[in-house]
Amino acid sequence: MKKFFSMVCACLLALSAQATDIKKYDALYENLPFQMEKVTRPQFPANEVNLKDFGAIGDGSSLCTTAFAKAIDALTQKGGGKLIVPQGVWFTGPIVLKSNINLHLEKGAVILFSPDDALYPFIDTSFEGLDTRRCQSPISGHNLTNVAITGQGCIDGNGEYWRPLKKQKVTDAQWKQITSRGGAFKRADYWFPTEGALKADNSANMNVPKTPASEEEWNEIKRFLRPVMISLVSCKNVWLNGVIFQNSPAWNIHPLMCENVLIEDVLVRNPSYAQNGDGLDLESCKNALIVNSTFDVGDDGICIKSGKDADGRKLGIPCENVIVNGCTVFKGHGGFVVGSEMSGGVKNIKVSDCQFLGTDVGLRFKSTRGRGGVVENIYIDNMSMFDIQTDVITFDLYYGGKSAVEVLNDGDEAKSQKVQKFKVDETTPCFRNIDINHVICRTARRAAYFNGLPEMPVSNIHIKDMEVNNAEYGIVINRTDGVKLENIKVSAKTHTFDAKNSKNVTVNDKTYKKIDEKGITLDF
C-alpha cells in the first residue's frame, strides 16, 4: 500500500509540474485578435517499457521493426504510457504509433530508418494536398488520441536514398558519391534514384504521379513515392518535444487534420539540397502552438497548408488557430510560408518573435490559379532577418513550383507581368486581411514583392514599422487593392517603392486611389 501511495503521489506531482510548465505560454494568448482555445499537453499513463526488453539491439544494423511494434502493443495493452528508446542507434523499418503512446528518446538515442523500400508498403494518403498513394511513412499515426514524440534523441529518415538530386545544390564530391549508387539521369545535372522514379517524374503533377495501371507499375515507380517522415493524420492531442528530426525522404513533419498540436523545442534539419525537404507542414489543423523550435532545411521552414485544388476544396478543412513564436529558420525556401496548397483556406494565424537567417524568403505567401481557398486574418509581429536571398516579404499568386531563387534565376517573374484576366470562381485563390508589424532585415535582394491576379488582387495588407537595410531593390507591388505601408524605411540601390495596376495604396498617410499600368515610383 505504501508503495502504491508513493507511485500515486509521484504521478500527481509529475502532472502538476507539467500543467505549471504549459502555463508559461499563457502570455501568447493575451490580446490575440481571434478566438482560440489554449493548446494543452496530452497526459499519459505512468506505464513505461524499454525497447531493449523486446529484443531490439541498438548497433545500427540489427533491424528493430518487430521490437518497436511489440513494445507499442505491450504498452497499449496496459492502457498506454512511455516507450523508452535508450542510447544507441536503432535501425528500423516503419513505426506505427497508437493512442496514448509517448515515444521517448533518451539522450544519445538515434532512430535510423532503413532505406529498403520493401519495408514501406503502399498506403492511400494525401501528399502535396492531393489524394494519392505513397509509401508508408517512417513514423505514422492515424485517428489517434494522445500521441507524443519526446526526449533528447534524434530521428533520421535516411532520406538521401529516396530523394532526387540537382547537381548545382551539392559539391562535386557529394554528387559523385550519391549518383554512384546507380539510378537514372533526367538531365546531366538532375539525378533520380531509380529508372522508375524518373519515369514517374516525367508524367507527375509536381510530386504526385499519374496513376499507374497495375500493381507492377506501382512497384516500378516506388522510389518516386517518397513518404513524409512523420505523418500524423486526424489525431487529437499531439506533442513533439526536444527531439531532432532530420534527413526526411520528403517533408519532415506533417500533421494533417489534427487538433490540439504542441510542437516545442525541436530541431528540424534537412540538407540544403533536399528536394521537397520542408521542415514543418501544418495542414488543415486546428489549435496548434509551435514554439522555440529551429529549422534548417532544403525547402520551406514553417509552412501552413490546407489541401490542393479540387481535392482540397472538397475536403474543405481550413488550417486555423495557430500560434508560432520564438522560432528560428536558417536555410530554407521560406521562413514562414502559407501555401501553395491552401484550397481549404487558412485563417487566424499569429506569428511573432521569430528570426530568419539566410532563408530564400522571409515571409512567403504563394498560390496560383486553380487552388481556390481564402487566406485571411494573418498577424505577424517582431521578425528579425539577415541575409535573405530574395524577398523579405513575398505575395505571389503565380507560383509555379519553383523556389524564389529559381524563379529569379530563370526569369519567370517577368513572364507573369502581362497576363489575361480570368473569371472569378471557386478555383480563384484569395489573400486578404494580413497585418505585418515590426520587421527588421539586414541584407536582402528586395524588401517586398506583391504579385496578385488581375481578377483577384492581393487585398488589405498592412505593413507597419519595417526597416530593410542593404537591399538591391525596394518594395514592388502589382495588382493589389488596399495595401497600406506605414513607417517604412528601406535602404536600396534603386527606388524604394514601385507600384502599378493597383488601387487604394497608402504610403505613409498618402493614398493613391488608382495606379495604372504605367505605375508610380517613389522613395521613402
What is the predicted role of each segment?
Residues 95-104, 256, 344, 372-373:
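Short, surface-exposed basic-aromatic patches at helix termini and helix-loop junctions that form
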Residues 80, 94, 114-115, 135, ...:
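Short glycine/acidic-rich loop motifs that flank beta-strands on beta-rich extracellular proteins
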